[in-house]
């Protein structure tokens, strides 16, 4: 197998065709494991070997069951499905057998809930690799991340005798909704890493640009609040009911009234409110889906605590039961200077790169930061960077596609990083 653009495009289009949402990436994980096994130099870890179930966020059993059934129907390797034990994602360990550093590289693998455009001008339609899973699409470029990760693995297999130390390639499930990284971090699988690197393709940068030091990663918590009241006839006996919808409505106004923190940026958004059973019934159930963000972990924790206090207070005020669930999370992270300089240096060595930006305000959240911070807290160094690529539409849009030539650029940046740290 040759490590060239043709091979990378082939992989990318294969994974683009079969997108799977978070915690249901059974076919994707199985296929990744197939390719890794063929390289014959990696130990492959799956399931509870890399996932701590106590820290799994936003995993719905119905989605898991459907994903597993679809993977089996599409021919996923039963050997890997059994080893997953219901949890997706994998880690590939290369051990050179020689003393040296350990590097962890993270690539996310899930898709988004978007129906891919049927426009004949859309390249995946022209070339026959559009999504076959209706309602799901790799509209954020994670199929490219999988491809780059496999490209790095192939390069390692071809250069294994020249390397020292260890490389751990993390194929992470459920990045969308920032749901997957915490469970991997809490498994301890990367606690021994001296270096951690991850990236995103395109996003805010076009072909020819690398953002070596995006800053202002926001800590975030995704929270669901559910209220349970009591139904009653809205005309004849409203006094017998306990109104969950009214409780939820008051919650929304109070949440948006949380005092902003004086030491940094805060954000809150209630994105979904669902309630009620009928126009003549006192609503007995309500659910809110919301997120808070903070400039750092402490500020985000302040926002989260305020949300929990409001939910509790409203439940008492309206005499309704309540429950809260954290369904996603990410933290802030500062890139380490040593790795920023390395990514700058490596990027400028690539003929396709003509611009390296080392000061970009990200002002969003990414759960790779949980893994990066985990490595930093254990004495290692971490970086998250942006690999520019021209795109046909914004991320999470039905028309999204990107410049496939940048797949090879991505592989070259990562392999150069490995080479400089482990040769």
UniProtKB/Swiss-Prot annotation:
Bilayer-spanning residue ranges: none
SUPFAM superfamilies linked: Bacterial exopeptidase dimerisation domain, Zn-dependent exopeptidases
Protein known as: p-aminobenzoyl-glutamate hydrolase subunit A homolog
InterPro entries named among the record's database cross-references: AbgA, Amidohydrolase, Bact_exopeptidase_dim_dom, Peptidase_M20, Peptidase_M20/M20A_hydrolases, Peptidase_M20_dimer
Functional description taken from the UniProt entry: Catalyzes the cleavage of p-aminobenzoyl-glutamate (PABA-GLU) to form p-aminobenzoate (PABA) and glutamate.
GO MF annotation terms: dipeptidase activity; para-aminobenzoyl-glutamate hydrolase activity
Natural source organism: Haemophilus influenzae (strain ATCC 51907 / DSM 11121 / KW20 / Rd)
E.C. no: 3.5.1.-
GO cellular component, one term: cytoplasm
Cofactor or coenzyme needed: Mn(2+)
NCBIfam families xref list: amidohydrolases (TIGR01891)
Keywords, in A-Z order: Hydrolase
GO terms of biological process kind: folic acid catabolic process
Family: Belongs to the peptidase M20 family.
Domain of life of the native organism: Bacteria
Entry keyword Plastid: no
Name of the gene: abgA
Any further remark recorded for this protein: Unlike E.coli, AbgB is not present in H.influenza and therefore the multicomponent hydrolase AbgAB does not exist in this form.
């Amino acid at each position: 197998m040759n490590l060239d653009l043709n091979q990378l495009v082939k992989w990318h289009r294969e994974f683009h065709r079969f997108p799977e949402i978070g915690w249901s990436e059974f076919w994707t994980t199985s296929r990744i494991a197939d390719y890794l096994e063929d390289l014959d130099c990696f130990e492959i870890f799956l399931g509870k070997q890399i996932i701590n179930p106590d820290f799994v966020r936003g995993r719905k059993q119905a989605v898991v069951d459907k994903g597993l059934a679809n993977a089996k129907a599409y021919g996923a390797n039963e050997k890997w499905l059994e080893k997953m034990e219901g949890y997706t994602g994998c880690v590939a360990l290369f051990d050179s057998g020689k003393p040296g550093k350990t590097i962890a590289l993270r690539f996310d693998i899930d898709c988004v809930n978007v129906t891919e455009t049927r426009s004949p001008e859309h390249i995946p339609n022209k070339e026959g690799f559009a999504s076959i899973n209706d309602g799901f699409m790799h509209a954020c470029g994670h199929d490219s991340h999988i491809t780059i990760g496999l490209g790095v693995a192939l390069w390692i297999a071809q250069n294994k005798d020249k390397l020292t130390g260890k490389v751990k390639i993390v194929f992470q499930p459920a990045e969308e909704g920032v749901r997957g990284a915490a469970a991997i971090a809490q498994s301890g699988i990367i606690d021994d890493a001296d270096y951690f690197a991850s990236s995103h393709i395109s996003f805010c940068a076009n072909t020819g640009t690398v953002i070596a030091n995006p800053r202002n990663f926001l800590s975030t918590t995704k929270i669901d609040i559910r209220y349970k009241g009591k139904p009653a006839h809205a005309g004849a006996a409203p006094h017998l009911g306990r109104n969950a919808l009214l409780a939820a409505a008051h919650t929304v106004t109070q949440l948006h009234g949380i005092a902003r923190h004086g030491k940094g940026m805060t954000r809150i958004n209630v994105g979904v409110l669902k309630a009620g059973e009928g126009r003549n019934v006192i609503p007995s159930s309500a659910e809110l889906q919301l997120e808070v963000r903070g400039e750092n972990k402490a500020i985000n924790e302040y926002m989260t605590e305020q949300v929990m206090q409001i939910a509790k207070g409203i439940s008492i005020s309206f005499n309704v039961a309540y429950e809260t669930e954290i369904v996603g999370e990410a933290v802030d992270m500062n890139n380490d200077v040593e790795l920023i300089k390395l990514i700058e240096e490596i990027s400028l060595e690539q003929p396709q790169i003509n611009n390296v930006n080392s000061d970009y305000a990200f002002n969003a959240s990414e759960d790779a930061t949980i893994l990066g911070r985990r490595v930093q807290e254990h004495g290692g160094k971490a970086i998250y960077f942006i690999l520019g690529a021209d795109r046909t539409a914004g991320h999470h849009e039905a028309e999204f596609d990107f410049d496939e030539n940048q797949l090879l650029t991505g592989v070259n940046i990562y392999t150069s990083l490995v080479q400089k740290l482990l040769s």
